[in-house]
From Swiss-Prot:
<feature type="topological domain" description="Cytoplasmic">
    <location>
        <begin position="156"/>
        <end position="186"/>
    </location>
</feature>
<feature type="glycosylation site" description="N-linked (GlcNAc...) asparagine">
    <location>
        <position position="235"/>
    </location>
</feature>
<feature type="transmembrane region" description="Helical; Name=5">
    <location>
        <begin position="298"/>
        <end position="322"/>
    </location>
</feature>
<feature type="topological domain" description="Lumenal">
    <location>
        <begin position="214"/>
        <end position="271"/>
    </location>
</feature>
<dbReference type="GO" id="GO:0015171">
    <property type="term" value="F:amino acid transmembrane transporter activity"/>
</dbReference>
<feature type="short sequence motif" description="CARC motif">
    <location>
        <begin position="432"/>
        <end position="442"/>
    </location>
</feature>
<feature type="glycosylation site" description="N-linked (GlcNAc...) asparagine">
    <location>
        <position position="227"/>
    </location>
</feature>
<dbReference type="GO" id="GO:1903826">
    <property type="term" value="P:L-arginine transmembrane transport"/>
</dbReference>
<feature type="transmembrane region" description="Helical; Name=1">
    <location>
        <begin position="108"/>
        <end position="128"/>
    </location>
</feature>
<keyword id="KW-1133">Transmembrane helix</keyword>
<keyword id="KW-0813">Transport</keyword>
<dbReference type="GO" id="GO:0015186">
    <property type="term" value="F:L-glutamine transmembrane transporter activity"/>
</dbReference>
<feature type="transmembrane region" description="Helical; Name=8">
    <location>
        <begin position="426"/>
        <end position="446"/>
    </location>
</feature>
<dbReference type="GO" id="GO:0006867">
    <property type="term" value="P:asparagine transport"/>
</dbReference>
<dbReference type="GO" id="GO:0015179">
    <property type="term" value="F:L-amino acid transmembrane transporter activity"/>
</dbReference>
<dbReference type="GO" id="GO:0032935">
    <property type="term" value="F:sterol sensor activity"/>
</dbReference>
<dbReference type="GO" id="GO:0034618">
    <property type="term" value="F:arginine binding"/>
</dbReference>
Length: 549
């Protein structure tokens, strides 16, 4: 009787991994042919022939009680989703509705979903990275890093397919790491994933402080009819400035001269509206309460703003390049007064930025699950990376080439290229305001992801209590405030966090998993070992280069 009372839709355990979904390969429902359904009622009576077939399913269920997956019914005997019925011990059958299945996207939607996910704050630092590496070497590094990260992402995507006799349809990359390396693999992937998320939140805090400062400054100057002239900048309608020409690049503000009705008003405003001394603390009042929301579904509605902001940035870059023209002069190894060499030893700073700019490895499996044509996953992933790489090249090359040298030196290009335009620039003001609102809605989403990953692993609950969540949020916000106060250089923050999380999730873990999988199948060759070992060394060198270059 105990055997008969077991539900026919019971899940099949597979070692330490347990799947709890309606996937037909994992769940073993009872199938009733349409001709064996008697009547058209909501609860349709099952014929005697169907009842006999039910007994066979009971027999299979006894076999599948074993941990050996080979005793499970073969996949080809499981009917298609639209023909599945669930048999009840009461003698009734219910048709499984397909409405709860995830919507599959065409390839074009999948490609732009990947593009939109990768287009983050790193795009603002690409021109600065090209300046650090040199114009020619910078372009080469963008192409090479795009190819390397694409291959590693391909290895992540294929990692679930190389595991035999286990249903991996709902697995993520941390599950794959746990399968191959146990608890160490799972926790290491989790820690480095948190590094990338918290690093992004710190960059967001610095940028939001920057955008709020410049937005408030624009409004104040407009209301009080104050004209500011930066001491270091070009003349003309399309002004470009050099905020830190001869001072510490992590200083608080650029040199500005006020002219208006009341100079003391401007000085008082600067005292209470400081980019590093006050603005980072003002943001606490706005963002800390938002982080404590139990659900982030409200903020998820504004994710489309990311696409709009990137499109506007592309328009802004194109317009500025047309207005300013190109200013290039090639010096291959020696610098001049206004230009940098084409090849510089600071190139690891660009590779660190690009590691995060091309980083999507921790969620690529999830994104590709919704692709309508799974056989095109590799092609769509490659096209998405091509689109991302072209976007970075377009923005980086145009800003670097259009930067007016002379009279300004290329060394003046800031880690956030919007800082090279005065706060009075209307088009840049629109970009800053738009990005400020967009980041205000995305920041709680990032905090929610940090909470889900960390609290879910430690407490088994995404919201164990208000106190736990509040302490975590205070820690994350505190990290952002400290960086915005003492080190507001988003280029360096991005490159350090990118190189650190990229070492594990981009270079080491995908390569090790692929080599271990080949070794277990007896297919590992010395050429594969050499190539993937070289990738691991590149990841280590990329991280070390951030500290020594």
């Amino acid at each position: 009787m105990d055997e008969d009372s077991k539900p026919l839709l019971g899940s099949v355990p597979t070692g330490d991994y347990y799947t709890d979904s309606l996937d037909p390969k994992q769940r073993r429902p009872f199938h009733v042919e349409p001709r064996n359904i008697v009547g058209e009622d909501v609860q349709e009576r099952v014929s005697a022939e169907a009842a006999v077939l039910s007994s066979r399913v009971h027999y299979y269920s006894r076999l599948t009680g074993s941990s050996d997956r080979l005793l499970a019914p073969p996949d080809h005997v499981i009917p298609s989703h639209e023909d599945i019925y669930i048999y009840s011990p009461l003698g009734t059958a219910f048709k499984v509705q397909g409405g709860d299945s995830p919507i599959k996207n065409p390839s074009i939607v999948t490609i732009f979903a990947i593009w939109n996910t990768m287009m983050g704050t790193s795009i603002l630092s690409i021109p600065w990275g090209i300046k650090q590496a040199g114009f020619t070497l910078g372009i080469i590094i963008i192409v090479l890093m795009g190819l390397l990260t694409l291959y590693c992402c391909y290895r992540v995507l294929k990692s679930t397919k190389s595991i035999p006799y286990v249903d991996t349809s709902d697995w993520e990359f941390p599950d794959v790491c746990k399968y191959y390396f146990g608890g160490f693999g799972k926790w290491s992937s989790l820690v480095f994933s948190l590094v990338s998320l918290i690093g992004a939140m710190v960059v967001y805090w610095v940028l939001m402080s920057n955008f709020l400062f410049n937005t408030g400054k624009f409004i104040f100057n407009y209301v009080h009819n104050v004209n500011t002239s930066d001491a270091f900048g070009t003349n003309g309608t399309e002004r470009v400035i050099c905020p830190y020409p001869d001072v510490d690049p992590h200083g608080n503000s650029s040199t500005s001269l006020y002219s208006g009705s009341d100079n003391s008003t401007g000085l008082e405003f600067d005292h209470w509206w400081s980019k590093t001394n006050t603005i980072p603390f003002y943001l606490i009042l706005l963002l800390l309460p938002l982080l404590n929301f139990r659900s982030a579904s409200f903020f998820a509605r504004f994710t489309f703003l990311g696409t709009i902001s990137v499109i506007y940035l592309i328009f802004l870059v194109t317009y500025k390049a047309i207005q300013l023209g190109f200013h290039l002069e090639f010096h291959w190894f020696d610098s001049s007064m206004f230009f940098v060499p084409e090849f510089r030893t600071l190139f690891p700073q660009l590779s660190g930025v690009l590691t995060l700019a091309f980083f999507i490895h921790n969620c690529i499996i999830t994104l590709m699950k919704n692709n309508k044509h799974q056989e095109n996953n590799v092609r769509d992933l490659s096209l998405a990376y091509l689109l991302v790489g072209l976007t970075y090249l377009y923005v980086g090359v145009l800003i670097f080439a259009a930067f007016p040298s002379p009279p300004l030196s290329k060394e003046c290009i800031e880690p956030n290229f919007l800082d090279n335009f005065p706060s009075s620039d209307i088009l840049v003001f629109v970009a800053r305001t738009f990005l400020l609102f967009q980041m205000t809605t995305v920041y709680p989403l990032l905090g929610y992801l940090v909470r889900v990953q960390l609290m879910g692993q430690i407490f088994g609950n995404h919201y164990p209590g208000f106190l736990h969540v509040f302490v975590l949020n205070v820690f994350v916000v505190g990290a952002g405030v400290l960086m915005a106060r003492f080190y507001p250089n988003i280029g360096s923050i991005i490159r350090y966090s990118g190189a650190l999380c990229g070492l594990a999730l981009v270079f080491v873990l995908p390569s090790l998993i692929h080599m271990v999988s080949l070794k277990r199948r007896g297919e590992l060759r010395w050429t594969s070992t050499l190539f993937h070992g070289f990738l691991i060394l590149l990841g280590v060198a990329n991280l070390l280069g951030q500290f020594f270059m």
